[in-house]
Structure formats: structure tokens, C-alpha cells
Design a protein with these regions (language model features):
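Bacterial Sec-dependent N-terminal signal peptides
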Residues: 1-21
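N-terminal beta1-alpha1-beta2 submodule of the flavodoxin-like/Rossmannoid cofactor-binding fold
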Residues: 19-98, 109-111, 120, 169-175
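Glycine-rich phosphate/pyrophosphate-binding loop and the adjoining helix
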Residues: 17, 155-175
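Short beta-strand->loop
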Residues: 29, 104, 132-133
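Short, glycine-/small-residue-rich phosphate/pyrophosphate-handling segment
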Residues: 130-163
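Structured segments of extracytoplasmic/periplasmic soluble domains
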Residues: 42-46, 50, 103, 117-122, ...
């Protein structure tokens, strides 16, 4: 009986230790229209990850998002490669995360510059960054290329464009 209890205790301790060693995952996202937010929530659930919304200090209005207007806020920000829109607040710490999914709508064939603000405000070296995006017509390819070029010291995976994904597409993405 003592032997059985000893084995059970050993197994419980080993299981508890391995559970604590699991990598912690974060899904951080910016969503202007709500589409990326829906995808981020699906990824968070499938990956059993924490969810964090990257919010601008000044919310974007529909006029700000009018890409046909060269004077709209988003157009002006995206023309300036050094533009870094201020976030309302930053996540308290990313230290505990090993994997960070970063989601965004594709703007002008790249990630909105608030994504750069988030990356530059946090220490992401040594973490695996997996981008995901939503878009009405662009791919994620150039966005990833631009992020890798801007942040060569970060480990940025290929990522995926996820427009209205199915549950199985989300599950496949997080594997």
C-alpha cells in the first residue's frame, strides 16, 4: 500500500512540475473594426493563451480609417515609417511569455504602426513571435517581411492571414 501511495505521489509531483514548465502564451492584437479581435479571441481559446488588446490612446474614428483620404489619420501615420501611435496603456509584463501571437489588420500592405509601438515598448528578444492578420485584399507576406526587416533581432515566424477562419483553421494555426 505504501508503495502504491509513493508511486502516486511521485507521479503527481512529476505531473505538477511538467505542468509548471509549459510555455505561457500571449495573444496581443490591434483591431480597428472588430474583425481581428474576433480572430484573436479564437486563437486565445485554441492556444489556451492570455489575451491582450493593443489599444491606441486616441481611438480611431471611421474618418481616421478612411484609406482613400490621404489626410486621414491612418493615411498620415502609414506614410511616415517612423510614426509610432501612442498606446492607451502597455501590458504590465511580457516576461512570463515564451510565445506571442501578434494580430493586426493589414494596412498599406504592412502592420499598422501601433504594432511597432507595442514591439518597441516590450522586451521580445528570445520569444517566438507569430503574426496573424486580417485583410480585405492584402496578404500577410509583406507585413512579416517588413517586421523582420525592422526587428532583425526578433524571432518572427511566417504567420498567417486569417479572414473569418473556421475552428479547424484556427486549431491548425496554433499547433
Amino acid at each position: 500500500m505504501k508503495k502504491i501511495l509513493s508511486i502516486i505521489c511521485t507521479m503527481l509531483i512529476a505531473f505538477g512540475a511538467s505542468a509548471q514548465q509549459k510555455s505561457k502564451t500571449l495573444v496581443a492584437y490591434f483591431s480597428a473594426s472588430g474583425v481581428t479581435a474576433k480572430v484573436a479571441k479564437q486563437i486565445s481559446e485554441a492556444a489556451k493563451a492570455d489575451l491582450y488588446e493593443i489599444t491606441p490612446k486616441v481611438k480611431y474614428s471611421s474618418a481616421d480609417l478612411n484609406w482613400r483620404d490621404k489626410q486621414s489619420r491612418s493615411s498620415v501615420e502609414m506614410k511616415d515609417k517612423n510614426s509610432r501611435p501612442e498606446m492607451a496603456e502597455n501590458i504590465s509584463s511580457v516576461d512570463q511569455y515564451e510565445t506571442i501571437y501578434i494580430g493586426f489588420p493589414v494596412w498599406w500592405d504592412v502592420a499598422p504602426h501601433i504594432i511597432n509601438t507595442f514591439i518597441e515598448a516590450n522586451k521580445l528578444e528570445g520569444k517566438t513571435i507569430i503574426p496573424f492578420a486580417t485583410s480585405g485584399g492584402s496578404s500577410i507576406r509583406n507585413s512579416v517581411k517588413d517586421l523582420r526587416s525592422t526587428y532583425p533581432n526578433l524571432t518572427i515566424k511566417d504567420g498567417q492571414l486569417l479572414n473569418y477562419p473556421t475552428k479547424s483553421e484556427i486549431e491548425s494555426f496554433v499547433k
